[in-house]
Amino acid sequence: MKSLFKFIAKSNLTQQILLAFALLTFSRLIWFTANAFWLPPIGIDEYIWAHLVGIYFDVPVVAAVFLPVWIWVIFGGQLREKHPWINKALFLLAALTTLIFNGIDTGYSQVTAKRSGFELFDMLGDDANKLTPYILDNLGIILGLAALGYFLFRIIPVRGQYPQVDFKGRPLRGLITAIAFAATCLVGFRGGLQLRPLRSIDASTFVAPEIAPLVTSTPLQIISTWQRNGLPNFDFAVQWPNNGTNNNTTDWLLKNTQPLPEFPMSRSQGGGWVQPNIVFIVVESLARDYTGFGNGTPFTPFLDRLAADPNTLYFPYCYANGTKSIEMVPSLFCGMPSLMSEFYVTSAYANNKVNNAFQLAKGYKTAFFHGSNNGTMGFQSFLKQTGLQQYHGIDQYPANLYKRDFDGNWGIFDEPYLQHFIRCMDTLNDGKQPVFASVFTLSSHHPYTIPKPYQGKLPGDPSTVQHTIAYADIALRKFFETASKKPWFENTVFVITGDHTSHSDKEYFYSQSGHYEVPVLVYSPGVNISENLIPGQ
């Protein structure tokens, strides 16, 4: 027994396992250093306990990600002795995989206030080129990873004592070793012998839920969310007394010609009433925190004035559906909450027919505008299958203005793009049909680029979202100044909100509720909305 413990202590396998745990602990330290500002204050005892529990939560990662290393070390035999570089290469590949994912999330968690899971892969897709600004902004981290990789390659122990498995000379011993290895890996994958495999959500049973992201790791979150289980099928049918048949609610709304004031967009009301244009303006990363009516530092003087206008309804308690732009479209236009571990737009259910605003807008021209690549986040394909008639992306932007108005990263700056949106509204408003259109801005997104004439002149830290929110507010002011001169303006209802929130320097806006608070304004320049409210709405 003593010789066994001595072998384990000196074994290269043991040294490599300990090195793997050390790397994950190092990643956790870096992640905490960068994200401590949004985590609740914790004592030194809680901090140490979180790291100790974190080692336990690293077991599935070490077992799964480093599996090729352990197979090679134990069963490599003579090839292992002849080609020690393979051991180094396998270990380095596994180590850099964990470090890279943890490194990416070290910065991204500052925006989402949580660990990212398998949705990271969905976010890449055809938008992988958009990672360039993140990489450039974190070039020091990239160089640090490269230096660490070289250091690891130099110190990874590959010579010395290894488990000797001889299937030819000692087949029974080899079989027992293989079974023991498989059993150990299985227990490692599950994180123990408990009834259910260890998942990131289990961290809340060891520490306070608010600091659970410190205990877990991004590789574990990816492992926990990679399996995409199907959802149960439901058929919600309604027995309508007027015809005595079972019809889907949406079918009834669209086919029945009886006037229904609660759904003014669904059909003509008669009596000479003119259906208004409906315009949704979704501002990237617009949180209530950045507005004057959010009791924060006001970066939105125009929106603040608009919220106080008698023709505006301001809703003080509204919440974004998630923390990523890709979650906005199905939520805002289809009423689809983010209850899956993946994005609805990229899920197997994206092609399902769902009730949506464009479908209910009977008799309306429908259009969606976004100044980025046409395929970004799958918006174009998803919206077109909902029944949207027109999608306007960067491909539809005037070629002669592209070079002047491109921000160098995501797409067209907000100010010129909103002016372009007005020109398109002029075309859409031909007097034959009302228009239901939405425009999604993009300037208030990392890397927070604004046009040169505004640089150094706006409030807020240029390295954060704040000064780009101030720019977006200016773009909105100029949008309404121009739009107010158009013949379609008075007969248009504008809905202004944010797709999600972003950074904050206030503790409340990193709470479970505050982190999702976005402003919602409904502005109708031609109608005093407060006099036409339906009770209870």
Residue positions per predicted region:
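Transmembrane and membrane-interface helices of multi-pass
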Residues: K2-L231
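Soluble catalytic regions of membrane-associated enzymes that act on cell-envelope
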Residues: Q194-Q537
